[in-house]
């Protein structure tokens, strides 16, 4: 969704800055060349985004309106049916050629939603035992804002954050990731941190509330990873925002070298990038890649 907004050349997105932090060359390639056609992994990832965002939305509305958590299976079944109907309709329109793939993933996704529901119910029970009111417990475990759009003229940034939570200590920003490889997620950790820190900066500007924490929801195994966001991290991203724009004026950055060359093996633009390289791989990079194969 951020890709469309980034077509305005003066605006960048949190995803673009995340690319820059991972590899300036990746950032440059994504700005200068098309992203290409959709792949099975991106389609499934987008579908899961839609599903879990709607789970947040429908679940909060239902539980809040009833003032309690329904304990019947029919309640969850009805909600999941509406969630799938919504997400399938969007995917059928966006990616008709991948519809069979999406259908095959519905059963395991339904199972994960059922486990996620149990997790959320336990979260509410635990908070209630700590003295939280039902309303406060719901607001703690389910987002205040979903798919919130940002547009900052101050920083020339635009984008959407998957979820924002409202807490007594300020806001918490969340991104949904569908990585099915924990090593891949680890290698891209710097990207994730930069992306969420950018969301934090934009949320603070828009809502005039502090953002000291961010979290990633990994939908493949329904677990959360959270981390603190310091002023130092925010200042670093603000500087990267300026540095990234300089690169667009200077031209293609050099390839990664040394230990950083390991990142190339985990980059989705690997083939495109290497086709643009005129020089042979240096010995250190070859050794680094050989160790991963």
Predicted regions span which residues?
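Charged, glycine-rich intrinsically disordered N-terminal tails and low-complexity linkers that flank
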Residues: 1-90
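Accessory terminal regions of nucleic-acid processing enzymes
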Residues: 2, 53, 57, 151, ...
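Active-site-proximal structural scaffolding
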Residues: 10, 189-192, 196, 260, ...
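A residue-level signal for conserved active-site and pocket-lining positions in enzyme catalytic cores
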Residues: 23, 48-49, 163, 199, ...
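Hydrophobic/aromatic-lined pockets within catalytic cores
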Residues: 33, 56, 60, 178-181, ...
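Short, polar/flexible loop-turn hinges at active-site or ligand-entry regions and domain interfaces
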Residues: 35-39, 184, 255
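A non-catalytic, helix-rich entry segment at domain boundaries
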Residues: 51-144
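Mg2+/Mn2+-dependent nuclease catalytic core
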Residues: 138-243
């Amino acid at each position: 969704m951020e890709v469309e907004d980034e077509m305005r050349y003066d605006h960048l997105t949190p995803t673009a800055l995340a690319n820059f932090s991972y590899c300036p060359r990746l950032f440059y390639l994504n700005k200068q060349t098309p992203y290409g056609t959709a792949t099975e992994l991106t389609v499934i990832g987008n579908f899961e985004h839609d599903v879990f965002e709607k789970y947040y939305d429908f679940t909060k509305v239902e539980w809040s309106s009833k003032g309690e958590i329904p304990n019947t299976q029919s309640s969850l079944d009805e909600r999941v049916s509406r969630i799938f109907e919504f997400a399938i309709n969007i995917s059928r329109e966006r990616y008709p050629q991948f519809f069979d793939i999406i259908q095959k993933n519905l059963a395991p996704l339904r199972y994960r939603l059922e486990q996620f529901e149990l997790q959320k119910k336990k979260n509410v029970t635990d908070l209630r035992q700590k003295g939280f009111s039902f309303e406060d417990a719901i607001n703690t475990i389910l987002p205040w804002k979903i798919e919130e759009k940002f547009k900052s003229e101050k920083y020339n940034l635009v984008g959407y954050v998957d979820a924002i939570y409202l807490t007594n200590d300020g806001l918490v920003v969340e991104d949904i990731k569908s990585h099915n490889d924990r090593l891949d997620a680890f290698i891209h950790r710097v990207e994730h941190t930069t992306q969420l820190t950018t969301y934090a900066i934009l949320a603070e500007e828009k809502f005039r509330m502090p953002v000291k924490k961010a979290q990633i929801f990994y939908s493949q195994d329904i677990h959360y990873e959270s981390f603190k966001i310091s002023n130092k991290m925010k200042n670093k991203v603000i500087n990267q925002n300026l540095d990234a724009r300089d690169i667009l004026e200077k031209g293609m950055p050099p390839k990664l070298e040394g230990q950083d060359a390991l990142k190339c093996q985990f980059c989705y633009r690997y083939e495109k990038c290497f086709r643009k390289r005129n020089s042979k791989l240096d010995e250190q990079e070859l050794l680094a890649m050989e160790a991963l194969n």
